Amino acid sequence: MYNGILPVYKERGLTSHDVVFKLRKILKTKKIGHTGTLDPEVAGVLPVCIGNATRVSDYVMDMGKAYEANVSIGRSTTTEDQTGDTLEMKGVHSADFNNDDIDRLLENFKGVIEQIPPMYSSVKVNGKKLYEYARNNETVERPKRKVNIKDIGRISELDFKENECHFKIRVICGKGTYIRTLATDIGVKLGFPAHMSKLTRIESGGFVLKDSLTLEQIKELHEQDSLQNKLFPLEYGLKGLPSIKIKDSHIKKRILNGQKFNKNEFDNKIKDQIVFIDDDSEKVLAIYMVHPTKESEIKPKKVFN
């Protein structure tokens, strides 16, 4: 039985569910879950939690992500990416803007911004996914959402051809960010229709492309009984949370028994969640959270016996 986090390279054409389904067949275990959906046409890093690591999948999902995207100015689509039907076209020429104009414009997207999610997305409105409305040719008001763009920058020269302009950007962002919406919004700021023509996720939850394995590589390693060496411990998925190492055996026992504590037994500055780690084994003991009605106390959220 495997336990740990496995960074998978999701190839284009597969859904995130396809990856999980195939892994369950390869590894012969059902206890597998991914940490955030990647659209079928998007390639890149998809961290997958296996065995007891499935208990930390939400925390991996909350950690930052990084993407490289191709932005195409001059044509918009129904899906905001290259898979959709054309909505609008407007010729773009090199006299319209240059590298410096794009660089200045991208600065405006840094920080917390508002996005309207695409109609072809899994965001729910009134209990129904937006893409279900879109497929039925129904219109519905889409709620604005705040997302965090930690960094964004151009990583290629502008390429003007056939009345369009193409360039690549790198984006570091929080969860819930739609890069294709970012591409269309860049076009709006320039005064042109636009779409995202290609997307690769280069980092997710602290895992990068070079650490990621294809399904074929995973199958080979499993057959060679050497896959466990490629798995990251579940503790890796909690590195985004503050932690305290516990030495006292009596306190360790109380933690593993799920007892409540006063903050002042550890740190009065605990604001939200805290991870307790065994000082001897470096293994996580539990995740605690501030008590919802007693701010001076912390209570267990997840205990790892």
Curated annotation (Swiss-Prot):
Keywords associated with the record: Isomerase, tRNA processing
Protein EC: 5.4.99.25
Domain of life: Bacteria
Enzyme class of the recorded protein, top EC level: isomerase
Tagged with keyword tRNA processing: yes
GO terms assigned for molecular function: RNA binding; tRNA pseudouridine(55) synthase activity
List of catalytic residues: 39 (nucleophile)
Entry-linked InterPro entries: PsdUridine_synth_cat_dom_sf, PsdUridine_synth_N, tRNA_psdUridine_synth_TruB, TruB_C
GO BP terms: mRNA pseudouridine synthesis; tRNA pseudouridine synthesis
Catalytic activity: uridine(55) in tRNA = pseudouridine(55) in tRNA
HAMAP family: TruB_bact
Function field: Responsible for synthesis of pseudouridine from uracil-55 in the psi GC loop of transfer RNAs.
Similarity remark: Belongs to the pseudouridine synthase TruB family. Type 1 subfamily.
Name this polypeptide is given: tRNA pseudouridine synthase B
